[in-house]
Curated annotation (Swiss-Prot):
One Pfam family here: AMP-binding_C
Places the protein is found: Cytoplasm
Protein name: D-alanine--D-alanyl carrier protein ligase
InterPro entries: AA_adenyl_dom, AMP-bd_C, AMP-bd_C_sf, AMP-binding_CS, AMP-dep_synth/lig_dom, ANL_N_sf, DltA, DltA-like
Biological processes, Gene Ontology terms: lipoteichoic acid biosynthetic process
Pathway given in the UniProt record: Cell wall biogenesis; lipoteichoic acid biosynthesis
Alphabetic keyword roster: ATP-binding, Cytoplasm, Ligase, Nucleotide-binding
GO cellular component, one term: cytoplasm
Species the sequence originates in: Bacillus cereus (strain ZK / E33L)
One Gene Ontology term of the molecular function aspect: D-alanine [D-alanyl carrier protein] ligase activity
The organism's place on the tree of life at top rank: Bacteria
Family in the record: Belongs to the ATP-dependent AMP-binding enzyme family. DltA subfamily.
Cross-referenced HAMAP family: DltA (MF_00593)
Length: 504
């Protein structure tokens, strides 16, 4: 598959087909091509000998997609940066990535960034003044060059830039279109922010099949009335989200085939799909196919998939995450470095062309997590699991990294920032489960000196500081104050004891 050519084909064959919809804003495939060509031409003229990544800032604006394609047509990887990401984290991404340029689809509130900022108005001028110019196709990102870089949580307090190449993305997109039986011209739900790699599961499968991306933003999600009004208008046929988002939608009685009569496929990734959520979806959408998938950002969105039927639900209380895509393979590694036999638990290692080339500017972290096996790139996921008859079962994290509401985070990073707060002497983050999946984060804090009379005022002050350093989804929901943190005999935090204390 020639990814960019495949997307551009629709600008010629169906130029007026809508490529992307967000509220009242929409763009056609013709406009997507013209504006991304104009932008790529401008980037190439401004930075003729430069291939540094470009930051793309915004939320669900159509310009985000235009900017992504404009960057890669000019030979630059893009770094999606959502509006919700705090200033301090944006600053660290800018510094780590070596980006020289930031394209903005929304007002940039972060100050003193070491990059040139192209505002919304500047972008419109570029689209207008460079209209009709086409970039040199030889300049476009190809092969093992980076297509996008997504920053994920890092245990040192610094986010890690996962480099995904053109070949990685082509491998994923081709597999998704074929294995999930995606058809030409379908409407895809776009619920995940672009800085979360779940969004890649809908963006490129939609664009290469001439589909329409229907974007739902965070404000809509916060207002159910607006959310369901939008869904009712959408005629979505391919649903891509975390299971948590679907579970929230199922709380609305009208969320069913009557609201979305042409729903054909549910694609789930990012966290555990509970058996009962899948069962309810089958009841509400009897004609739709439900696919459960698995994969870390470092292996390009997902590498396994399984069609969840009533038979599968009856057979497994905890659902399997699927069979591996044909060009990759899964190894289950035991602690001694040998491969575990069928049915035995160990660390999931992914091998093949979906695997990232590593973390940008972090050779030590890359060496720790990535390796070569039989001449192919391999990623040690840190996830526990086992394979039985080719079917992968996921058993949670081996370390302190978890997925909460679809967002992957390292508890050590949150602890790092929490301990840096005023009024905090010591802190441990305890993820609290509800059934099979994590429900919220509890911060167990040993407070330092403070003058607050009430605990809730202390909590407010700590949360205020955390909001300046971490995205909202990484802020603990509850706080508990103790005089000390339990330790193991070898001087480590006794997390098992702490968990038993807080859940007793």
């Amino acid at each position: 598959m020639k990814l960019l050519e495949q997307i551009e084909k629709w600008a010629i064959e169906t130029p007026d087909q809508t490529a992307f919809v967000w509220r009242d804003a929409k763009i056609t495939y013709k406009q997507l091509k013209e504006d991304s060509d104009a932008l790529a031409h401008w980037i190439s003229s401004e930075y003729p000998d430069d291939r540094s990544p470009i930051m793309v800032y915004g939320h669900m604006q159509p310009e985000m997609i235009i900017n992504f394609l404009g960057c890669v047509k000019a030979g630059h990887a893009y770094i999606p940066v959502d509006l919700s990401i705090p200033a301090d984290r944006v600053q660290r991404i800018a510094e780590n990535s070596g980006a020289k340029l930031l394209l903005s689809a929304a007002t940039v509130t972060v100050t003193d960034l070491p990059v040139r900022i192209v505002s919304e108005d500047n972008l419109k001028d570029i689209f207008f003044t460079h209209k009709g110019n086409t970039p040199n196709p030889e300049h476009a990102v190809k092969g093992d060059e980076n297509f996008y870089i997504i920053y994920t949580s890092g245990s040192t307090g610094n986010p890690k830039g996962v480099q995904i190449t053109y070949n990685c993305l082509v491998s994923f997109t081709q597999w998704a279109v074929e294995d999930f039986n995606l058809q030409t011209g379908q409407v895809f739900l776009n619920q995940a922010p672009f800085s979360f790699d779940l969004s890649v599961m809908d963006i490129y499968p939609s664009l290469v099949t001439g589909g329409t991306l229907w974007a739902i933003d965070k404000d809509m999600i916060a207002r159910p009335k607006d959310l369901f009004a939008s869904l009712e208008q959408s005629d979505i046929q391919v649903w891509t989200s975390t299971p948590s988002f679907a579970e929230m939608c199922l709380m609305e009685a009208s969320f069913s085939e009557s609201m979305l009569p042409n729903m054909k496929t549910f694609l789930f990734c990012g966290e555990v799909l509970p058996n009962e959520v899948a069962r309810k979806l089958i009841e509400r959408f009897p004609k739709a196919t439900i696919m459960n998938t698995y994969g870390p950002t470092e292996a390009t969105v997902a590498v396994t998939g399984i069609h969840v039927t009533e038979e599968v639900l009856d057979q497994y209380k905890s659902l399997p995450v699927g069979y591996c895509k044909s060009d990759c393979r899964l190894l289950i590694m035991k602690e001694d470095g040998t491969i575990a036999p069928d049915g035995e638990k160990g660390e999931i290692v992914i091998v093949g062309p979906s695997v990232s080339v590593g973390y940008l500017g972090s050779p030590e972290l890359t060496e720790k997590a990535f390796t070569m096996i039989d001449g192919e790139r391999a990623y040690k996921t840190g996830d526990a699991g086992y394979v039985e008859n080719g079917l992968l079962f996921y058993n949670g994290r081996l370390d302190f990294q978890i997925k909460l509401h679809g967002y992957r985070m390292e508890l050590e990073e949150i602890e790092h920032h929490l301990r840096a707060c005023s009024y905090v002497e010591g802190a441990v983050i305890v993820p609290i489960k509800k059934g099979e999946k994590y429900d919220y984060l509890l911060a167990v804090v040993v407070p330092g000196e403070h003058s607050f009379e009430k605990e809730f005022k202390l909590t407010s002050a700590i949360k205020k500081e955390l909001n300046e350093r971490l995205p909202n989804y990484m802020i603990p929901r509850k706080f508990m104050y103790q005089s000390s943190i339990p330790m193991t005999p070898n001087g480590k935090v006794d997390r098992k004891k702490l968990l038993s204390e807080v859940t007793a």
